[in-house]
Regions:
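Short, structured loop/turn "capping" segments at alpha-beta junctions
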Residues: 21-23, 52-54, 128
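Generic hydrophobic secondary-structure packing signal
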Residues: 4-7, 55, 114
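N-terminal helix-turn-helix DNA-binding core of bacterial DNA-binding proteins
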Residues: 1-33, 62
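Basic amphipathic alpha-helical segments that dock to polyanions
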Residues: 41-46
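Non-DNA-binding regulatory cores of transcription-related proteins
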Residues: 64-138
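Key DNA-contact positions within bacterial/archaeal DNA-binding proteins
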Residues: 36
Length: 138
């Protein structure tokens, strides 16, 4: 997992809380990143119909999805987030050893199951839930 998921959630909560359009610069300042990174991540949210962009004086990004029902799983899927993944595989599928040739497949299945459990958990949490947590913390 990379920081894109965190950035997307942060931006969506900002947009929900503001109730208006915000520029990539305004979002970047609140997120503490650069506007180019914000635009890159929000492109996936725009494609998924969660935000829209507008040009002009009142331009920027505007939340179009209902934050009450927008789950963190939907956000993760919109930006292709995998929570548990491993790019490196031990062993060699061409070797004549059950452990050496089979470990990568077993571990990939394990990672997929862990990723699905994370996604199932995130299905229960919405953008409004995150916003509420932020404003009820002591």
């Amino acid at each position: 997992m990379d920081s894109s998921f965190n950035l997307a959630i942060h931006a969506l909560v900002c947009l929900s809380h503001s109730g208006r359009s915000l520029s990539s610069e305004a979002l970047a300042e609140n997120i503490c990143t650069n506007p180019t990174r914000v635009r890159r991540v929000l492109a996936g949210l725009k494609k998924a119909g969660m935000v829209e962009t507008r040009e002009g004086l009142d331009g920027g990004y505007r939340l179009t999805a209902d934050p009450v029902s927008l789950s963190l799983r939907q956000v993760a899927e919109a930006i292709n987030t995998r929570f548990v993944d491993c790019a490196w595989h031990s062993g060699d599928i061409d070797r004549d050893c059950a452990i050496c040739s089979g470990m990568a497949g077993v571990m990939d299945a394990l990672y997929r199951q862990m990723d699905e459990q994370c996604a199932a958990y995130l299905e229960q949490i919405t953008i409004t839930d995150i916003e509420t947590q932020l404003f009820t913390q002591k």
